[in-house]
């Protein structure tokens, strides 16, 4: 069996640790814990790392297509490896949740998130496992674009680091249990 764990974000130093790159931050954390490094794959338009866990190959994926085209990389990888939608887990930021809150879902709309919208368009379904990490709404009249492309302030960053640990725990639990429904019951709350 093979699993794809995909963190959404934008490539490049300009976007490093911005709110929209929470998915990349989590995937980087998982790679660090597994002591694996990323290599860029031009065909898949993604940075990839992999490891084995309980006999399963786990791919850590950071699409390099920029957020709004993330579905291209996800679709290419699913197709190439002949994977089912159940083998996919997407990790991304959510404006409508408080900073640092997490929510696991097995289906749903894009909710205004262009990366998720792209994935839904490319794979043809809204039914796929996902972990949402809250980044909060813009404050003081700030535009959504400016908000998601800005860095966290100190207090927000502390909350995000705590959520990254919780998401890391939930992803590891999911990989061990091989049951997303059970993982949602344990970590949503």
UniProtKB/Swiss-Prot annotation:
One of its GO terms (biological process) is rescue of stalled ribosome. The active site is at 20 (proton acceptor). Its EC number is 3.1.1.29. TRNA binds at residues 15, 66, 68, 114. GO terms for molecular function: peptidyl-tRNA hydrolase activity; tRNA binding. It is found in: Cytoplasm. Its main location: cytoplasm. GO terms for cellular component: cytoplasm. It catalyses: an N-acyl-L-alpha-aminoacyl-tRNA + H2O = an N-acyl-L-amino acid + a tRNA + H(+). The record marks 93 as: Stabilizes the basic form of H active site to accept a proton. It holds the Pfam family Pept_tRNA_hydro. Monomer. Belongs to the PTH family. Hydrolyzes ribosome-free peptidyl-tRNAs (with 1 or more amino acids incorporated), which drop off the ribosome during protein synthesis, or as a result of ribosome stalling. This is Peptidyl-tRNA hydrolase.
């Amino acid at each position: 069996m093979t699993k794809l764990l995909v963190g959404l974000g934008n490539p490049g130093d300009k976007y490093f640790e911005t709110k929209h790159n929470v998915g990349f931050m989590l995937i980087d954390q998982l790679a660090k814990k597994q002591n694996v490094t990323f290599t860029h794959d031009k065909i898949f338009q993604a940075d990839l790392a992999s490891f084995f866990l309980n006999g399963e190959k786990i791919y850590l994926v950071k699409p390099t297509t920029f957020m709004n085209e993330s579905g291209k990389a996800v679709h290419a990888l699913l197709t190439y490896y002949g994977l089912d939608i159940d083998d996919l887990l997407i990790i991304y930021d959510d404006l409508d949740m408080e900073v640092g809150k997490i929510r696991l879902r097995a289906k749903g709309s894009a909710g205004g998130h262009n990366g998720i919208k792209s994935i839904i368009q490319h794979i043809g379904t809204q039914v796929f496992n996902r972990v949402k990490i809250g980044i909060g709404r813009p404050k003081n009249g700030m535009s959504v674009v400016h908000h998601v492309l800005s860095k966290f302030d100190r207090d927000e960053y502390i909350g995000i680091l705590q959520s990254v640990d919780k998401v890391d725990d939930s992803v590891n639990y999911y990989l061990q249990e091989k049951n997303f429904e059970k993982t949602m019951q344990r970590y949503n709350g």
